[in-house]
């Protein structure tokens, strides 16, 4: 099919966003962990290495839950009550400052 938003690849080129900052903020729907904390059912959890973090906030933008927040010093942190351990943040981090480690029970 090779379409985007009902347009062919060539027609869609002008609407493809080049920067993370160009993407719109998405609202949080009622089915998220905002109203349903995950608790501790994760298998893996993300851990931030501040020495590698460049404060680009890509992890924060891509996190599907309200689990990543920005601390007063500008670094990101994980609120494990809301993190479901999906690993999107670690996968999107350009400097690999976030690693997924086995959850200890």
Swiss-Prot record:
Subunit structure: Heterotetramer of one alpha, one beta, one delta and one gamma chain.
InterPro entries on file: 4Fe4S_Fe-S-bd, 4Fe4S_Fe_S_CS, PorD_KorD
Residues that, per the record, bind [4Fe-4S] cluster 1: 53, 56, 59, 93
Domain 4Fe-4S ferredoxin-type: 44-73, 74-103
Stretches that traverse the bilayer: none
Alphabetical keyword list: 4Fe-4S, Electron transport, Iron, Iron-sulfur, Metal-binding, Oxidoreductase, Repeat, Transport
Coiled coil stretches, renumbered: none
Single GO MF descriptor: metal ion binding
Catalytic reaction(s) noted: 3-methyl-2-oxobutanoate + 2 oxidized [2Fe-2S]-[ferredoxin] + CoA = 2-methylpropanoyl-CoA + 2 reduced [2Fe-2S]-[ferredoxin] + CO2 + H(+)
Name listed for the protein in its UniProt record: Ketoisovalerate oxidoreductase subunit VorD
Enzyme nomenclature, EC number: 1.2.7.7
Gene: vorD
UniProt remark on cofactor binding: Binds 2 [4Fe-4S] clusters.
Binding of [4Fe-4S] cluster 2, residues: 63, 83, 86, 89
Cofactor: [4Fe-4S] cluster
The organism of origin for this protein: Pyrococcus furiosus (strain ATCC 43587 / DSM 3638 / JCM 8422 / Vc1)
Enzyme superclass (EC): oxidoreductase
